[in-house]
Regions:
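Charged DNA-binding/catalytic regions of mobile-element recombinases
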Residues: 1-280
Length: 280
């Protein structure tokens, strides 16, 4: 649609303004009928039954994707409010100093961030896991886990996995400098880990002490991952959890919508970017 005001167009064409109107655009999902709300509710419940931690925005994205619908986000919210399906609002309390920098990057493979998190099991075991996530496309493309505490050697193996996942197993180093962002955990700051990162072409950077917000993308991922997958799962022992991890990471990459990606999953977003780059 032109950005020239309609009044100006009418003056140029020498016609009366009251006789000209913008052609209204049809809704992608058709006309709005409240009689169809029971069907919308059924589709919403098909999502929330398996994704009880999803708020209305992510439910809206999943319903439209799964059922190829074109519902407005506000309609999904109204139906969920009407039938008591809305999540209780979460209160986020900020502690420590604010992070004023920008973690996200304008393109993929400019900055990767990594972190370690723990999953306590009912048996008393604690599973340690580490991951690598791209600071642009949000894909978790490498991870490792063990029922023992992770070491610097595990992180160096994780670096190899990240390199091969993005650039192929024949690559000995990344084709261009990529920042490797982590906290100050001993696995990451060990001299051997720092030197190995440089060998691979990575540029290791760490967050300031007592400032986890500076690795906020990794922190946010851990919070989301635990809420959406770990909480309420079968956590009998480390072996049971380890058997589920691959499926959880795969679902996160292929299905979970991200607001930063226009409510697309990281796989959908990367596929679109690949199509765009190949068409140029």
């Amino acid at each position: 649609m032109t950005r020239v005001p309609l009044t100006v167009i009418c003056q140029v064409l020498q016609i009366a303004r009251r006789t000209a109107y913008y052609v209204s655009r049809a809704r992608p999902g058709g006309r709005y009928h409240r009689k169809a709300d029971p069907m919308v509710l059924e589709q919403i419940r098909a999502v929330t039954n398996s994704r009880a931690t999803y708020g209305y925005r992510r439910v809206w994205a999943m319903v439209n994707r799964t059922f190829r619908a074109g519902y407005n986000r506000k309609r999904i919210r109204r139906v969920m409010q009407l039938y008591g399906l809305m999540l209780a609002p979460r209160v986020h309390r900020r502690h420590g100093r604010p992070h004023l920098g920008r973690i996200e990057q304008p393109a993929s493979n400019q900055r990767w961030c990594s972190d370690v998190f723990l999953i306590p099991c009912w048996s008393g075991e604690v599973l340690s896991a580490a991951f690598v996530i791209d600071c642009h496309d949000r894909e978790v493309f490498a991870w490792t886990a063990s029922p023992r505490p992770l070491t610097g050697a595990d992180i160096r193996t994780l670096m190899d996995k990240a390199l091969w996942a993005r650039f192929g197993e024949r690559m000995l180093k990344v084709p261009h400098a990529i920042q490797w962002l982590s906290d100050n955990g001993p696995q990451y700051t060990a001299t051997a880990s720092v030197l190995y990162a440089h060998e691979l072409g990575l540029v290791p950077i760490t967050t300031p002490s007592y400032s986890p917000q500076s690795n906020g993308l990794a922190e946010a991922f851990v919070k989301t991952f635990k809420r959406d997958y770990v909480d309420g799962a079968e956590l009998r022992d480390a072996e049971t959890v380890l058997a589920q991890l691959s499926g959880w990471f795969d679902d996160y990459n292929t299905r979970a919508p991200h607001s930063a990606l226009g409510m697309r999953s990281s796989d959908e977003y990367r596929a679109e970017q690949l199509t765009l780059s190949s068409s140029r």
